[in-house]
Amino acid sequence: MAIASSIGLVAEAIHRHKTPERPIESENDIARYPAEDEQWALDELQDELCQEEPSDSEDQPKKKIRNPAKLADDFLKRYPPPPSGSAPAGRLPLPVIIPQRRPGVRVRGFVRAYAPDLQACGIDQDTFMDFLVTMTRAGRAPQWMGAANLTAAAAFALPGHAIGCGVGFAIQVVNAIAMEMRGRVQANGFLQKLNQGFFQPRGLYCLVLSFDNTHEEAMTDESLATAIATTTDPKTGVRKYTDKLRSHSGTTGPSEFPESAPLVFPVLDWLETNANAEQAEKLGRYKKFRKFVADYYDRRAQAEYAARNPTSPLAAPPRRGFTSKLADPNDDTNKSPISLATGGLVPYNTTWRETRNSEGRRPPRKIADKVLYMIIVNMPSDDDMSRAESIMATEATTEPSVQSDDAEAAKG
């Protein structure tokens, strides 16, 4: 339970602060707590250590807004496609998945991180950092609409696309305040242009997705292929216009990511050898805290697995116990929101919900609701695209009411 684990972390941190510091046991595995929390913290640490305000955020409304089409053209001039006839670029072994910088504030862009796997595809670190900064500028809403504050918001959902294995994929469009609507048009058009002139010539495709955790199946390569086919398919009628308003390429489920490429944080790497005394002190403190948090979640995982699998040879309890019952996942206090609120007086009687696999490892990375993710994948093959398009075409014939609604709206 996330609430209990967070409360337990605070309790452990307070005890650690009051007692002599001891070495952390899991120093070789310091990134095993929730991925988005880790990435957001590292991204914010980069800003803090450099003592810079985000240069492309809502915090600087007076900065000149450039035409996103011009931004895309300038970027493509700086980084033209590979010459025709050149050796084909490499392929990504895993998709690159980068979350937005701060939930709920889309114009902040995405976490400033780089996947070294992109190097084999012809995209080096400096190029990718330039892309992230430029995309953030392209998505900033125009100043002259800053006074608009429309409170009405409505959701308009295009039909979902049934994908193999029952994975649901649906494009959702939210009509919110006018400033955000205009900003969404800019970011969407910029990314489409960059896909055509930058990513696709290098064998890649970049799309921005949000996720609907109500679906029960795991996201697959086929669902990504369908999302790409959807964004590259010419639009007509209402779909042509709603496509321009959506802030992300699609909404898909469910709650688990596929395995993704490792990320590095360029500013932190640079500071490892170039930091001044104050920056080095902050960086050192943060590293210690990361190790402490990773050790805490690692001990919770070991304790939970040992409780559920007492006869397994892998079920070794953590070598170091918990200083508070609020931190111990096996204490009755932490087994449900009710037991937590009552201090364990109301018992938890239902069965354990599985959160670890049979080997006691941490579960797959969970997708956060209401968060946008930038995903870069290998461009699907023609066969993959054809299969995805046929799935969409088949579904379209089974939804006459939706299609007729689109047609009527287009006529209007």
From Swiss-Prot:
Feature: compositional bias, Acidic residues: 36-58
Composition skew (Polar residues), residue ranges: 395-404
GO biological process, one term: antibiotic biosynthetic process
Keywords for the protein's UniProt record, in alphabetical order: Antibiotic biosynthesis
Region (Disordered): 1-66, 308-342, 386-412
Record-linked InterPro entries: Burnettramic_acid_biosynth
Physiological role: Part of the gene cluster that mediates the biosynthesis of burnettramic acids, an unusual class of bolaamphiphilic pyrrolizidinediones that display potent antibacterial, antifungal, and cytotoxic activities. The first step of the biosynthesis of burnettramic acids is the hydroxylation of proline by the proline hydroxylase buaE to generate 4-hydroxyproline. The PKS-NRPS buaA and trans-enoyl reductase buaC construct the highly reduced polyketide chain, and the condensation (C) domain of buaA then catalyzes the amide bond formation with the activated 4-hydroxyproline.
Protein name as annotated: Burnettramic acids biosynthesis cluster protein E
